[in-house]
Amino acid sequence: IVDQQFEIAQKIADAGLTPIIEPEVDINHVNKLSVEKLLVDKLQKCLKTFNNCILKLTIPDSPGLYDKLDCKKIVALSGGYSLDEACQRLKLQKNMSASFSRALSEGLTHDQTEEEFNSKIASNISKIAEAS
């Protein structure tokens, strides 16, 4: 799957855009750290021939695991973690920024008043910005 994503990313780059490659690791996988290490090995190989991309990755269990990946930017998926846990995990990483669309919307509901909605989303944005 990673090879396929890089093949498509090359086509996107050839069209003048910066591709985002998103090989997500399931946060509930019993061997998450092992899978993440396998993914890093594969990404390092792929990035040797094409690194004009942004990687959107699950926050690793091991701080700094992605530090040596050579690409334009690495952003973190909240990946199913709660907003607070995703932010705590992200703070342990040096070179990752948040891309937390699901966590950003945590606690937002259709029946909130505009004031409640604005207050909650402002709080979420603040937590994510601080973690990044």
Positions of predicted regions on the chain:
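Catalytic beta/alpha-barrel core
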Residues: I1, T18, E22, N31-D61, ...
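Glycine-rich anion/phosphate-binding loops
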Residues: I1-E7
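Long, contiguous binding/interaction regions
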Residues: A13
